[in-house]
Amino acid sequence: MTSAGNPAVDPAARPFQGGRRLPLTWLGVTPFFVYVGLFLLLPTVVIVAGSITAGDGSLTLANLTNIQQAYLVKAFLNSFIVSLVSALIGAIGGALLAYAVATGNPRGALRRTVTSASGVLAQFGGVTLTFAFIATLGTIGFVTLFLKDRGLDVFANGVWLYELSGLILIYTYFQIPLMVLVFLPALDGIRPQWREATESLGGSTWHYWRYVAGPLLAPAFLGCTLLLFANAFSAYATAAALISQGGIIVPLQISNLFTSETGRAQPGLAKALALAMIVVVAIVMLLYALLQRRTSRWLR
């Protein structure tokens, strides 16, 4: 029995010798930190070290300066174009679809169908997605042949599917569902009472969106757009499956520099490119986090 002067002590909170408590509450997140350390921090350290190391093991900045070569700068520019255009298209299309879902029945079939499909399609990329587009819109795809039989040649001005425009089209396929998933919570945070208050004060729909909903949703929309940009900027598998030769975007250039078939592999330069990508994505995600923090103030 426990006396009144000696209450029972929870074994999980029993102190060590010296007064320190056993931090059992941290055990639940230990696998997360191990995962982050192995698959995020450790690769980053390897990339940073490799980007400033020469082939003989000595320190050098040549790899970092060599990323200024014209063909690598062009690859970065192409990556920015593909990421920005697909992010804007995905953000606008996804926001409109998310708004249609948010204004509908919260337990209706439309919301369940769209959210379930978005959860699947947002992760539907790589070889599978590329094959689907090639089988549909490739040079001998069934849609291409169907239109050609009716006098419409979609590739009359070139096989654009295997160029930047094709990448933008394919990236948009998973950008729109991702936008639905990340922007829908912000739309759900808009309360109907705010529109009613605007109307009771004599405001129109324009006033509601201009002075109430618009300013509230703008940080969330911009943050989600940045997330889509980072998602497209770092994508590799889809582009690699679509474009087997050449390196029109940075991830493909990194792959080519690692696995050169002519014996001229440059792993140091490849790691320098990867480091530049990490810096770009880190800046984008930092801006995204700042915008999300501002959005969370009124979503509480």
Walk through the language-model features, giving the residues of each.
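Interhelical loop and adjacent transmembrane-helix boundary motif
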Residues: R14, G19-L22, L64-Y71, A240-L290, ...
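C-terminal transmembrane helix and the adjacent membrane-cytosol boundary/short C-terminal tail
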Residues: T2-P11, F16, W26-G28, V46, ...
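Membrane-cytosol interface at the C-terminal ends of specific transmembrane alpha-helices
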Residues: F155-E199, T225
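Transmembrane-helix boundary motif in ABC transporter permease subunits
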Residues: V85-S118, F131, A135, A289-R293
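Membrane-interfacial helix termini and adjacent extracytoplasmic/periplasmic loops
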Residues: G18, L61, T130-T172, W206, ...
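Transmembrane alpha-helices
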Residues: P31-F39, M179-L184, R191-P192, G203-A235
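Short membrane-interfacial helix/loop motifs at transmembrane-helix boundaries
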Residues: N6, F33-V73, G141, K148, ...
